[in-house]
Amino acid sequence: SGLYIYPSFIDVHTSFGIQTPKRNAGSGRSAQYQASRDGYYWNDHILSDYNGIEDYSYNKKEAEQLRKVGFGVVNTHRANGIHRGTSVLVALGDPLPDSDRLINTKAAEHFSFKKSLTSNQSYPSSVMGSMALVRQFYHDLSWYKAGNAKNKDLAIEAAISNQNLPKIFDADDKLNTLRAVKIGKEMNLNF
């Protein structure tokens, strides 16, 4: 009694309630080769360990705008990096507490060919380099899973624990979509 069911759309690719980080102030990209974070992947544009729930905050005003155009659920992630980490699936119900709004706190893994705004690493400097980095990451992941690594890599371990999640690739255009599909086939990933 007093409850209603409304049909609605699901936006599977949004940054609802998650702020895009600001570009680092100061110098431009450098020939930095080591990760700026100890214990993580050597390239700072691989952020597979990031979980969208870490920075998520419900935005009533934005939720109202989305509901007005027919959306009731969003899959939200941080648009930052080549491997962007995981997203959060959120119901857009204002009177609900977050515990009821959060449908899944690890809904999917997100990817793009764009570098992280928070890193000054210069590599990769092209789409081809981004493609090579994704390939290298998944080759390294296979090598790591086989027990060949002496040190822990938290970014690779996060990707291993999230390997069964759906994969969403922000390709930006049709040629990059074809490139993402090609990488997916090569690395046995379903984008």
Region roles according to the model:
Residues I53-E54, A171:
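Residue-level marker of alpha-helix boundaries and capping positions
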Residues Y58:
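Phosphate/adenylate-binding glycine loop and adjacent helical scaffold
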Residues E62-F191:
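Polyanionic/metal-chelating signatures
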